[in-house]
Amino acid sequence: MLTRKQYELLRFINERLKESGVPPSFDEMKDALDLRSKSGIHRLITALEERGFIRRLPNRARAIEVIKLPEVAGNGGGRRGFTPSVIEGNLGKVRPSGGGVVDDAERPVAVPVMGRIAAGTPIEALQTRSHTISVPPDMLGSGEHYALEVRGDSMVEAGILDGDMALIQRNETAETGDIVVALIDDEEATLKRFRRRGASIALEPANTAYEVRILPPNRVQIQGKLIGIYRKY
């Protein structure tokens, strides 16, 4: 899981390498992230290296290699990993347009919040609509959508935090690698990665402190797939 600044720096380094083949200087990185000192960049670089996203090459100045990037799920969901598209809480508001008309295709969409979902020990999912959140339409794609408030930390390594709003596309099926809302025994709902293991279904956490749950298909009902995260800062 990357912090916002870590992700911004990784993206900046990767874009600069694509453009010129040369990584940015520490001063350029500091300016790009609007930091006051280069010590903050050093800490971010070290964190990215420890997490395996970049590598500093020895005995070479400004030698940084990007090893991998967080995978971002599209509407179909990630197959190998998931780093959610994160919407800040104020992005759902219509920006002032100086009196102009906002195109319908750009208007935020009201998505109903249907209750809580466990990213930890399964809890009962509330099925009553409490309120709505405004989401940019290009986050949603086609189909019916709803949101659930995440409770727990079992998906933190996928970038899904306690208190986040999980944006869900209603779906009764899933492919291996999808992060899904799974209803267990018609009683408990949980947010986990879906995989098939022979004739069974595995619900995998993204936190080594939690165990994988292996269940027969008749005990698991897919209620939707994760397409994004709404997070307030």
From Swiss-Prot:
Substrates-to-products reaction catalysed: Hydrolysis of Ala-|-Gly bond in repressor LexA
UniProt keyword list: Autocatalytic cleavage, DNA damage, DNA repair, DNA replication, DNA-binding, Hydrolase, Repressor, SOS response, Transcription, Transcription regulation
Site positions per UniProt: Cleavage: A119, G120
GO biological process: DNA repair; DNA replication; negative regulation of DNA-templated transcription; proteolysis; SOS response
Molecular function via GO: DNA binding; serine-type endopeptidase activity
Transmembrane spans: none
Gene3D superfamilies tied to this protein: Umud Fragment, subunit A (2.10.109.10), Winged helix-like DNA-binding domain superfamily/Winged helix DNA-binding domain (1.10.10.10)
CDD domains: S24_LexA-like
Superkingdom per UniProt: Bacteria
Enzyme superclass (EC): hydrolase
EC numbers, comma separated: 3.4.21.88
Keyword Transcription: yes
Record SUPFAM superfamilies: LexA/Signal peptidase, Winged helix' DNA-binding domain
Active-site residues, Swiss-Prot/TrEMBL: S154, K192
DNA-binding region: 26-46
InterPro entries noted in UniProt: LexA, LexA-like, LexA/Signal_pep-like_sf, LexA_DNA-bd_dom, LexA_repressor, Peptidase_S24_LexA, Peptidase_S24_S26A/B/C, WH-like_DNA-bd_sf
Family: Belongs to the peptidase S24 family.
Oligomeric and partner information: Homodimer.
General function of this protein: Represses a number of genes involved in the response to DNA damage (SOS response), including recA and lexA. In the presence of single-stranded DNA, RecA interacts with LexA causing an autocatalytic cleavage which disrupts the DNA-binding part of LexA, leading to derepression of the SOS regulon and eventually DNA repair.
Protein name stated in the entry: LexA repressor
Organism of origin: Nitrobacter hamburgensis (strain DSM 10229 / NCIMB 13809 / X14)
